[in-house]
Swiss-Prot record:
Post-translational modification as stated in the protein's UniProt record: Acetylated within its nuclear localization sequence, which impacts subcellular localization.
Modified residues (N6-acetyllysine): 82
Key word Glycosyltransferase present: no
Subcellular location: Nucleus; Cytoplasm; Secreted
Stated name of the protein: Interleukin-1 alpha
Family per record: Belongs to the IL-1 family.
Gene expressing this chain: IL1A
Length: 268
């Protein structure tokens, strides 16, 4: 686990150096206080290595933080609705999954001092299937279907929804992310939707089995977001890009208009 530098130890050193320097200058008042002479109190042993809430009265007393994340559900008025810490050892309920996907006022508190390599070294562990044999319709009421030209998807208006591709949505969880990552697998197959670069078609990638842990194959993962009645699938590997449709174009990755990134999940 990465260790947060003890900033207050640095302050103590600066304070000591500053006072030594001041003693050598005759014209400075002996009563003058150092810039670093703040009202910091030493940490008690029982506070070390513990996660503490950071309000105004406590920020000066905390020197080490845990790298577990808190998810804070906040109402539009600013009132905290729900606060919880996500851990691989916790049981996540259906309500939790819906809240994470659906709550547009969710605020993620992340450790700011973590090194990039620490944050990017994320393992996603399989949680469970949350949708089976569902259909994805875009905002133009087009359904996703297989494209005959290769391992691709396209969107079309269907009179018979039985012709649409059926997807299983599988949820994953990690200690570093508080959003809800999912995979989209074509039902009764091992073909997974795989994100590519912007404007490139998504691929249907065959896997030997449903991955129990995803570490390097993050192209298979999408953060499922729900806003009102619409669903969005943001790439974990390319976090500015969403699964999208466009007239006369294969299903691809896009950041927004003119491509359509809004979908509805239709249950079987």
């Amino acid at each position: 686990m990465a260790k947060v530098p003890d900033l207050f130890e640095d302050l103590k050193n600066c304070y000591s150096e500053n006072e030594d320097y001041s003693s050598e200058i005759d014209h400075l008042s002996l009563n003058q206080k150092s810039f670093y002479d703040a009202s910091y109190e030493p940490l008690r042993e029982d506070q070390m290595d513990k996660f503490m809430s950071l309000d105004t009265s406590e920020t000066s007393k905390t020197s080490r933080l845990s790298f577990k994340e808190n998810v804070v559900m906040v109402a539009a008025s600013g009132k905290i609705l729900k606060k919880r810490r996500l851990s691989l050892n916790q049981f996540i309920t259906d309500d939790d999954l819906e809240a994470i996907a659906n709550n547009t006022e969710e605020e993620i508190i992340k450790p700011r001092s973590a090194h990039y390599s620490f944050q990017s070294n994320v393992k996603y562990n399989l949680l469970r299937v949350i949708h089976q044999e569902c259909i994805l319709n875009d905002a133009l009421n087009q359904s996703l279907i297989r494209d005959l030209s290769g391992p691709y998807l396209t969107a079309a208006t269907l009179n018979n929804l039985e012709e649409a591709v059926k997807f299983d949505m599988v949820a994953y969880v990690s200690e570093e992310d508080s959003q809800l990552p999912v995979t989209l697998r074509i039902s009764k197959t091992q073909l997974f939707v795989s994100a590519q670069n912007e404007d490139e078609p998504v691929l249907l990638k065959e896997m030997p089995e449903t991955p129990k842990i995803i570490k390097d194959e993050t192209n298979l993962l999408f953060f499922w977001e729900k806003h009102g009645s619409m669903d969005y699938f943001k790439s974990v590997a390319h976090p500015k890009l969403f699964i999208a449709t466009k007239q006369e174009k294969l299903v691809h990755m896009a950041s927004g208009p003119p491509s359509v990134t809004d979908f509805q999940i239709l249950e079987k």
